[in-house]
Amino acid sequence: MEPTFSLIVAIAAVTICITAFAIYTAFGPPSKDLQDPYEMHED
């Protein structure tokens, strides 16, 4: 396997992992701990 191909696969894997973690945090069980600053703000 060429080093360039290995680098591309590694970068793609890291990008996919970061995206999956962000989606899990936004919509999964940890989303219950997120706070909306606009809802908390009193006018």
UniProtKB/Swiss-Prot annotation:
Q: Which organism is it from?
A: Synechococcus sp. (strain JA-2-3B'a(2-13))
Please explain the role this protein plays, according to its UniProt record.
May play a role in photosystem I and II biogenesis.
**GO CC, any one term:** plasma membrane-derived thylakoid membrane
From the Swiss-Prot or TrEMBL record, give the protein name.
Answer: Protein PsbN
Determine the domain of life of the protein's source: Bacteria
Which topology term describes how it sits in the membrane?
Single-pass membrane protein
Note the HAMAP family from the entry. Answer: PSII_PsbN
The alphabetical list of record keywords is: Membrane, Thylakoid, Transmembrane, Transmembrane helix
Aminoacyl-tRNA synthetase: is it a keyword of this entry? no
Q: Which Pfam families match?
A: PsbN (PF02468)
The reply on keyword Transcription is no
**Would you kindly state one Gene Ontology biological process term found in this protein's UniProt entry?**
photosynthesis
| Transmembrane annotation, as ranges | 7-27
Mainly localized where? membrane
Query: What taxonomic lineage is listed for the species of origin?
Result: Bacteria, Bacillati, Cyanobacteriota, Cyanophyceae, Synechococcales
Location in the cell reads: Cellular thylakoid membrane
User: Which family does the UniProt entry place this protein in?
Assistant: Belongs to the PsbN family.
